[in-house]
């Protein structure tokens, strides 16, 4: 029993330490930019030794990937909890509202995510991370939509929505379009709602 308990405590300690590293790294990334950050910067921010840091993460790419995944999971949990707590029924209207709220969000995670997107063109390692993140996002969409469709739409449908969200996020952060988008939130929401309403019609026709 003590051996098992010790293993669990050690495991939890490692998970907590990795979370601390991610939180510290996020601040460094936002301050210096991802491409300008090296592991020594993370060492200084966390106070860990080289061995201590590399025991948990081998590169800034690994840290960034976990930050992105953690953000995706947290948002999914928040959405699912919101639907459950409010007794909401998932519909094109509700989902379009969630999509637009995500696009208009203004927080450190969004800033880091857009920084990540901007680096993709010049960095093959980050491209590989993006492919993984996109696959996980599509899977999260499928789980969320499993009760809405008789037959789930193709991956291309969800990929289209991810591309729309990414385009909107980059417009808000890089082109300073957030205020303009907020003023036109009603129309943006209607655009997404129309798209998913049509996708559902095709689903009904197949049934």
For the regions a protein language model found, what residue spans apply to each?
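N-terminal intrinsically disordered/low-complexity leader segments
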Residues: 1-16, 203-207
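Helix-turn-helix
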Residues: 7-9, 20, 24-62, 66
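Residues in soluble alpha-helical coiled-coils and helical-bundle/repeat scaffolds
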Residues: 58-62, 66, 87, 104, ...
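Hydrophobic alpha-helical connector segments
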Residues: 66, 80-107, 154-162, 185, ...
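Short, basic, alpha-helical segments at the C-terminal edge of helix-turn-helix-like DNA-binding modules
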Residues: 69-75
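Amphipathic alpha-helical segments used for helix-helix packing
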Residues: 91, 104-128, 174-178
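Short alpha-helical scaffolding segments that buttress acidic/His motifs in well-ordered protein cores
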Residues: 99, 113-117, 165-169
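Hydrophobic/aromatic-rich alpha-helical bundle segments in the mid-to-C-terminal region
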Residues: 127-131, 135, 147-207
